[in-house]
């Protein structure tokens, strides 16, 4: 059997996330169906991680096993001819049998976009969180610096977590202005808890509003209690940028 790795870009607006679900169209389901059309085989795609409904990816990685002899270039070209325009295979590569898109991850990078101005955007409404009130970006950046290092991130996990270990190591947590009224929170870590990035953003926005102080943000991290943190930011501003192995 061959082990094929795919690098995938997708707009998550029209999907119920990555993982196959009984009551909603997902990205995994669509790609698996097109692989079956090409190879005549049903395969199981394993991704670096699951993205929620409405979340986007610039560099999702997934792998599958197949006995098909289609060249790797044929996989990405063929799949792109079959897939809808909001899902793109950027590349395909044949990997060693031991490669696993989920368990081999060393680092992941996410970016969360905020549109910080009073009027919303017709163009960017599916790619950013429109927040019309003023935000103190410097205060948000100072607070984000407290995320660096290996910590228990229980305060920022989902109400119904999908793992028992809440400890993750964050290598980068940075706010940056990209264009007028837009800024981005880039966070890089060895892994992320369910809803972790969106919960971090929601809490940091409270810092930017002046509702939570820098010291208060530190205490939220130490509390290890989801109830102490801010709201979950909406999904459409979140992008999985890349995965390192």
Enumerate the language-model features and the residues they cover.
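Structured-RNA-binding interfaces characteristic of tRNA pseudouridine synthases
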Residues: 1-245
């Amino acid at each position: 059997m061959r082990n094929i790795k795919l690098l995938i870009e997708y707009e998550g607006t029209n999907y119920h996330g990555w993982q196959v679900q009984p009551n909603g169209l997902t990205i995994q389901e669509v790609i698996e169906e097109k692989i079956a059309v090409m190879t005549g085989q049903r395969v199981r795609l394993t991704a670096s991680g699951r993205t929620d409904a409405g979340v986007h990816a610039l560099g999702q990685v997934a792998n599958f096993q197949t006995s098909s002899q289609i060249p790797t270039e044929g996989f990405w070209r063929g799949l792109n001819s079959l897939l809808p325009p909001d899902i793109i295979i950027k590349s395909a590569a044949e990997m060693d049998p031991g490669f696993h898109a989920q368990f081999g991850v060393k680092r992941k990078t996410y970016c969360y976009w905020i549109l910080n101005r009073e009027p919303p955007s017709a163009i960017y409404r599916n790619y950013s969180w429109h927040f019309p009130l003023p935000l103190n970006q410097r205060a948000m950046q100072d607070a984000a610096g407290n995320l660096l290092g290996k910590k228990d991130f229980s305060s920022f996990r989902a109400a119904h977590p999908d793992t028992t270990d809440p400890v993750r190591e964050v290598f980068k947590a940075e706010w940056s202005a990209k264009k007028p009224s837009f800024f981005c929170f880039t966070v890089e870590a060895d892994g992320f808890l369910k809803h972790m990035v969106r919960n971090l953003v929601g809490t940091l926005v409270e810092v930017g509003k002046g509702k939570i102080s820098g010291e208060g943000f530190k205490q939220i991290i130490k509390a290890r209690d989801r109830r102490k943190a801010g709201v979950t930011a909406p999904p459409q501003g979140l992008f999985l940028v890349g995965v390192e192995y």
